[in-house]
Amino acid sequence: MNTQQLAKLRSIVPEMRRVRHIHFVGIGGAGMGGIAEVLANEGYQISGSDLAPNPVTQQLLNLGATIYFNHRPENVRDASVVVVSSAISADNPEIVAAHEARIPVIRRAEMLAELMRFRHGIAIAGTHGKTTTTAMVSSIYAEAGLDPTFVNGGLVKAAGVHARLGHGRYLIAEADESDASFLHLQPMVAIVTNIEADHMDTYQGDFENLKQTFINFLHNLPFYGRAVMCVDDPVIRELLPRVGRQTTTYGFSEDADVRVEDYQQIGPQGHFTLLRQDKEPMCVTLNAPGRHNALNAAAAVAVATEEGIDDEAILRALESFQGTGRRFDFLGEFPLEPVNGKSGTAMLVDDYGHHPTEVDATIKAARAGWPDKNLVMLFQPHRFTRTRDLYDDFANVLTQVDTLLMLEVYPAGEAPIPGADSRSLCRTIRGRGKIDPILVPDPAQVAEMLAPVLTGNDLILVQGAGNIGKIARSLAEIKLKPQTPEEEQHD
């Protein structure tokens, strides 16, 4: 950003008083890195620490940030404020050093709230669909020439980044309920896509507590703000009388203010009509598969319509929507002759979904768009607590694929829980008599164990939130072909 652009921005968004150097602990996370990127472009000195380099840290290095690939007390020296990821423990040496030096330590969402303070904030919350909906809203506002700032939890593929500093008055941000930190945000508009039991350790295992927290989040809206909520979701329908703010509903339901009608999917695209109050019907072509993405688009359209954005800009943005990283992310289609000697091809799709509802939506999108394909899923459960709490739901949804390969649970720092492991889950699924799951004990064996089950007309879904995304990219790089010891050594 040049001096003239920065001066224009400062006329809208004042500089944070006495803050020059901002240090991020856990800077390599998508949400943390996105905020750091916006602040770097605003002219602040940025430093941060993480355990290993990744594309997020590389992008920040390119912007002039200082990155430490360790956690040491001296890393916070001279920082005006320290921003901490929810994944970082209180005994982290940098956090301890910051407290000792009386440097303010704040959570990620508190810094996001500061970015939102002087802008027209649009926050997207909900158990599922936040990242994609945030990207859709951002794409529509950009297409309309409003030059928004956005901070997303996933890669916005059209922009090639998780976050971007715009010169307009809008800030569009994903709001994270996993640690209840979204309560720091005070947006003008809030979308809630759905509410399900997840991250229940944050809410003391009490679903009523989770529901009340969403209500509290919506009460952060000013009385002239607006809540945009999916009325198809039974929990949201239950909570509507308690919102106490102007509300627009959306969904397939007949009583939705913005209603999805006549949905059909052809390959990776959805086609449907949106019915809006006092507006002409909108015939949408959405470059994203699945009924769940039609709902995400309906939320984005509801917000854009309320803002007065032209229908043509909305339609252009949705038809050209490029999606987000690891959300039904098409990685290629590969011939099987070099893989297992069979004719034909296999499509490879990478998807972040790790809750049964998300996995179910991904499977349905795959079946609707490619009904004749042999559907093969490589699944990595994420967290032992989630596997335990949603065990039966996982067992039910995973039987919907034709072939299932399962990696060990990605612990995300949790200790193992007896009976909440992949071997037990495979045994339960096998006992239901629909499919015979294959346990993959070592990620290095994925290509070797995948090759024999491919038929030549396959769609492979690589599914999960752990390190399985790296496995998906590795499969794409080797074009699904199992590697010989010599090839592995060469790599």
Curated annotation (Swiss-Prot):
Enzyme class, UniProt record, top EC level: ligase
GO molecular function: ATP binding; UDP-N-acetylmuramate-L-alanine ligase activity
Pfam families according to UniProt: Mur_ligase (PF01225), Mur_ligase_C (PF02875), Mur_ligase_M (PF08245)
Gene Ontology cellular-component terms listed: cytoplasm
Pathway: Cell wall biogenesis; peptidoglycan biosynthesis
Its EC number(s): 6.3.2.8
One GO BP annotation of this record: regulation of cell shape
Gene3D superfamilies assigned: Mur ligase, C-terminal domain, Mur-like, catalytic domain, NAD(P)-binding Rossmann-like Domain
Sites where the protein binds ATP: G126, T127, H128, G129, K130, T131, T132
Top-level division of the source organism's lineage: Bacteria
Keyword Glycoprotein: no
Keywords: ATP-binding, Cell cycle, Cell division, Cell shape, Cell wall biogenesis/degradation, Cytoplasm, Ligase, Nucleotide-binding, Peptidoglycan synthesis
Location in or out of the cell: Cytoplasm
Catalytic activity entry: UDP-N-acetyl-alpha-D-muramate + L-alanine + ATP = UDP-N-acetyl-alpha-D-muramoyl-L-alanine + ADP + phosphate + H(+)
InterPro entries, sorted: Mur-like_cat_sf (IPR036565), Mur_ligase_C (IPR004101), Mur_ligase_C_dom_sf (IPR036615), Mur_ligase_cen (IPR013221), Mur_ligase_N (IPR000713), MurCDEF_pg_biosynth (IPR050061), UDP-N-AcMur_Ala_ligase_MurC (IPR005758)
Record function comment: Cell wall formation.
Family to which the UniProt record says this protein belongs: Belongs to the MurCDEF family.
Listed name of the protein: UDP-N-acetylmuramate--L-alanine ligase
Organism: Shigella flexneri
